[in-house]
């Protein structure tokens, strides 16, 4: 078996030591796909140069995957724009790797380009199970998104950990789709947009004929920031992409209520994870510049912090924001209770989304997690249960957000394997 008891132990130790799961091959030759999908030459090299941190917008992908085609608006969500064959990501089982650009929508229903990476075992049979794995991207920079980060060590909190999830899937003969779920603006916390990117990435995976995955079953998985994208995708699936065959989703450590997340991290008191709350605010500003002009309410320290975070990954965001508070970086709090602010937060909080996840859900968290509202998470799961969704919740014995990822990993993946196998779905819905 791929994960021996010793390897499981090493994984848990490594994950906790590295901040616990906030959750080399040569360059391949491009393979032509049937028209009308253009296949680009393989991108030279697998590293990304350092990017400046003193500018506002996210730095774009240095390749051409995110380039908008002239006919983007006429394409359907999930239609493939272009694809490129890529080398195997670091520390993963050798596999066939593709990056696929596709049409998707932003939060306002406008067309944009999404990107997903798909790994499949060599010489795989058609229509194998596929896991859509939403990486732990609590970030502001395009270099932190999977299309780049799987080839670098830019985000040392997530990058050593995520390959374990990739390898678990590949070792079982599954494919794995890894979307850039923060979109082309790297709009962290724009959860509704992220869910749409995930679903359209699955559509693109089934429509790209060289992969032979047209009739595949899909499961979703993600922790922390990746869990928000996973939760949004599973919640929106029935209305946004009802034809997508999702057999289940795994949510880990998911902040389901952005307002409560901000309150937990605090406005008056300094907090070691304040950087995540500020990054979420700035990410929402990128997606909703008119409704949330956050930058105009920042003082000099806030603007300096914003510049330092502009293209930062998780570890950098945590370092820049360590010990700060909203009181320290804001000129005023006029926006906090503004109707526009509350509306945007509600639109991007899974707890207040009117849609209901229909596919089974496995949800796990630490009962004493200081970064999420467990009360909101439990209420969301109860609402799904009342609507008939089969939910299994696991309250791990982990004391906080980081170590809970390691503790919940294996039971979550075994649950997922059972969904692909068509076994009866357990549920511990209550109340």
Task: Name these PLM-found stretches.
Residues 203-274:
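Primarily recognizes the serine-hydrolase "nucleophile elbow" in alpha/beta-hydrolase
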Residues 117-118, 127-139, 143-151, 249:
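Short beta-strand element of the alpha/beta-hydrolase
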Residues 333, 337-344, 348-351, 368-371, ...:
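C-terminal catalytic histidine-bearing segment of alpha/beta-hydrolase fold enzymes
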Residues 357, 362-369:
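Short beta-strand/loop motif that positions the catalytic acidic residue
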Residues 32-125:
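Catalytic-loop region of hydrolases
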Residues 1-33:
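Secretory targeting and sorting signals
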Residues 161-165, 188-210:
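Alpha/beta-hydrolase active-site loop
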Residues 44-64, 68-71, 255-354:
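Accessory cap/linker subdomain of secreted extracellular hydrolases
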């Amino acid at each position: 078996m791929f994960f021996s008891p010793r390897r499981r132990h090493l994984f848990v130790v490594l994950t906790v030591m590295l901040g616990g799961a906030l959750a080399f091959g040569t360059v391949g030759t491009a393979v032509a796909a049937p028209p009308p999908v253009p296949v680009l030459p393989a991108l030279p090299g697998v590293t990304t140069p350092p990017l400046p941190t003193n500018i506002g917008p996210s730095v774009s992908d240095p390749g051409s995957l995110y380039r908008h085609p002239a006919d983007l608006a006429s394409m359907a969500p999930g239609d493939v724009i272009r694809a490129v064959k890529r080398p195997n990501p670091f520390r993963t089982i050798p596999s066939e790797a593709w990056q696929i650009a596709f049409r998707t929508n932003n939060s306002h229903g406008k067309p944009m380009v999404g990107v997903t990476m798909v790994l499949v075992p060599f010489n795989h049979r058609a229509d194998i199970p596929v896991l859509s794995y939403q990486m732990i991207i609590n970030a502001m920079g395009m270099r932190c998104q999977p299309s780049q980060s799987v080839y670098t060590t830019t985000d040392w909190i997530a990058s050593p950990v995520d390959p374990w999830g990739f390898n678990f899937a590949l070792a079982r003969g599954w494919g794995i789709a890894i979307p850039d779920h923060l979109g082309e603006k790297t709009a962290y916390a724009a959860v509704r947009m992220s869910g749409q990117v995930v679903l359209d990435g699955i559509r693109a995976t089934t429509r790209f004929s060289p992969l032979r995955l047209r009739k595949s079953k899909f499961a979703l998985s993600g922790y922390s920031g990746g869990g928000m994208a996973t939760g949004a995708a599973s919640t929106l699936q029935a209305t946004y992409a009802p034809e997508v065959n999702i057999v289940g989703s795994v949510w880990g450590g998911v902040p389901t209520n952005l307002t409560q997340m901000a309150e937990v991290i605090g406005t008056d008191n300094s907090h070691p994870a304040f950087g995540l709350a500020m990054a979420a605010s700035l990410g929402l500003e990128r997606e909703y510049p008119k409704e949330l002009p956050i930058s105009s309410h920042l003082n000099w320290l806030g603007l300096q912090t914003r510049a330092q975070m502009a293209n930062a990954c998780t570890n950098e965001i945590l370092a820049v924001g360590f010990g700060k508070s909203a009181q320290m970086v804001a000129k005023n709090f006029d926006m906090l209770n503004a109707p526009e602010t509350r509306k945007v937060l509600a639109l991007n909080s899974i707890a207040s989304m009117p849609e209901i996840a229909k596919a089974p859900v496995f949800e796990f968290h630490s009962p004493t997690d200081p970064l999420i509202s467990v009360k909101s998470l439990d209420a969301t799961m109860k609402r799904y249960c009342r609507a008939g969704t089969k939910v299994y919740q696991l309250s791990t014995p982990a004391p906080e957000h980081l170590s809970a990822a390691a503790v919940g990993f294996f039971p979550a993946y075994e649950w997922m394997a059972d969904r692909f196998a068509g076994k009866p779905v357990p549920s511990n819905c209550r109340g």
